[in-house]
């Protein structure tokens, strides 16, 4: 089941990636930390697999973390934050990290996440703060049962 969940999650993420650029202006210049200067060499598919294979997330929590991550991702879209080839790795790794901190009983520290994701501890801390600000400090985004069901159906 876990492998199937990850594959479906990857398919969902691939359908969310767009060529649309995130427009940076005075109101949202904090998003710069979420955008890579250069397109990462590792594909988003391999990057997601690496995160889930690392055992940093308990396998029994995969589904909950995936659903929570997709929910947060949908909320970010309403803020004009999209996944593209320069932002997907940073946004997804940070959203998965935030989701694991909510779901996992004993989540790993940011140092472990930084090492796994190939960024500095300072960068992961900045990305975490940025996403929390963009999410209006609300990691428990409340959605209707129908919206939750739609997200679940889109993945599974």
Model-derived features with residue positions:
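Acidic, Ser/Thr/Pro-rich regulatory low-complexity segments at or just upstream of the first helical elements
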Residues: 1-86, 114, 125, 129, ...
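Alpha-helical bundle/repeat cores within regulatory domains of eukaryotic proteins
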Residues: 88-94, 99, 103-121, 128, ...
């Amino acid at each position: 089941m876990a492998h199937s969940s990850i594959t479906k999650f990857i398919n969902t993420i691939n359908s969310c990636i767009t060529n649309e650029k995130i427009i940076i202006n005075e109101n949202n210049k904090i998003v710069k930390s979420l955008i890579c200067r250069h397109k990462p060499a590792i594909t988003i598919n391999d990057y997601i697999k690496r995160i889930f294979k690392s055992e940093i997330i308990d396998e029994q929590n995969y589904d909950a973390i995936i659903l929570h991550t997709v929910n947060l991702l949908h909320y970010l879209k309403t803020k004009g934050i999209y996944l593209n080839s320069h932002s997907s790795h940073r946004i997804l790794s940070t959203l998965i990290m935030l989701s694991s901190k909510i779901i996992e009983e004993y989540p790993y520290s940011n140092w472990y996440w930084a090492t796994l994701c190939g960024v500095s501890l300072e960068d992961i801390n900045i990305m975490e703060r940025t996403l929390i600000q963009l999410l209006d400090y609300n990691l428990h985004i409340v959605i209707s049962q129908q919206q939750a069901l739609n997200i679940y159906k889109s993945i599974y």
